[in-house]
Design a protein with these regions (language model features):
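Short, conserved beta-strand element in jelly-roll/cupin
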Residues: 1-11, 62-65, 70, 93-97
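Short, surface-exposed, charge-dense and proline/glycine-enriched linear segments
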Residues: 1-8, 43-53, 105-113
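Compositionally biased, intrinsically disordered low-complexity regions enriched in proline and serine
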Residues: 6, 40, 45, 89, ...
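Double-stranded beta-helix
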Residues: 11-75
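Non-heme Fe(II)/2-oxoglutarate
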Residues: 34, 68-70, 74-113
Length: 113
């Protein structure tokens, strides 16, 4: 998955956050048990993320407009709570199993950059 900030993302306007190493199978099971959730539960509330981040490494990714972030969507992630202003971003999902184009050569010329 990727995301591009369309305006500056600061600590106060909901920057992207992720819990480091939360995508491993062992950590996912441990997190589910600690939160009394049935595994695999892929949805976490802001309260859940706050609890998780107290014992793990919550990473906040601030950046200027145009910043591109690539990340594994199986990581526990969110937009931080808004304290002021707004944060705009475009997200993109990629699924290699259902990818329409298998290689760059098959993309029509009018769609290339």
């Amino acid at each position: 998955k990727s995301m591009i900030y369309l305006n500056d993302a600061k600590d106060t306007n909901g920057p992207f956050q992720l819990v480091k190493n939360s995508n491993s199978f062992f950590n996912a099971i441990k997190t589910s048990i600690n939160l009394n959730k049935t595994y695999p539960n892929t949805r976490f509330t802001n309260e859940d993320v706050e609890k998780i981040s107290q014992s793990k490494n919550l990473q906040t990714l601030t950046g200027k407009a145009g910043t591109l972030i690539f990340f594994d969507p199986s990581l526990i992630h969110r937009g931080a709570p808004l304290l002021s202003s707004e944060r705009y971003a475009i997200t993109n999902y990629y699924d290699s199993e259902h990818n329409y184009y298998n290689s760059i050569e098959k993309i029509p010329p009018e769609c290339r950059f």
